[in-house]
Amino acid sequence: MTLYQLKVWTIAAKHQSLTKAAGELHISQPSVWHHINLLKNEYRINLYKGSSGRKIQITREGKLFVKYAANVLLQVKKLDNKFKGKRKKRGKQK
C-alpha cells in the first residue's frame, strides 16, 4: 500500500467514478483502476462493484476503507504541515 494508492481510492470513491477520478488526478482511467486493484489484491477486499469507468458502487468494505484511508492522508498532511513548516521557519530565522 502506498499513500498515492490511498489518494487514488479516496478520490475515486468521492466521485464514484474511475473516469472522474482519472480526470482529477490527471492520469488515465486504466491507471486509476490499476492502483485500486493493487489495494484490492493486497487487502483481499472488494472496494466497489462495477467495472466500467462510469458509475461505480462503493461496497460496505470500500466505504470503511475510504474512511481509514482519508484519515491516514489527513494525518500525513498534518505531519507535513507541522514539521515542514517548522523547518521553513527555522531557515528564515538564520
PLM features: residue spans?
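Residues within the DNA-recognition helix of helix-turn-helix
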Residues: 28, 35-38
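A short LG(V/I)-centered, amphipathic sequence patch enriched
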Residues: 40-58
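Short, solvent-exposed amphipathic helices
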Residues: 60-75
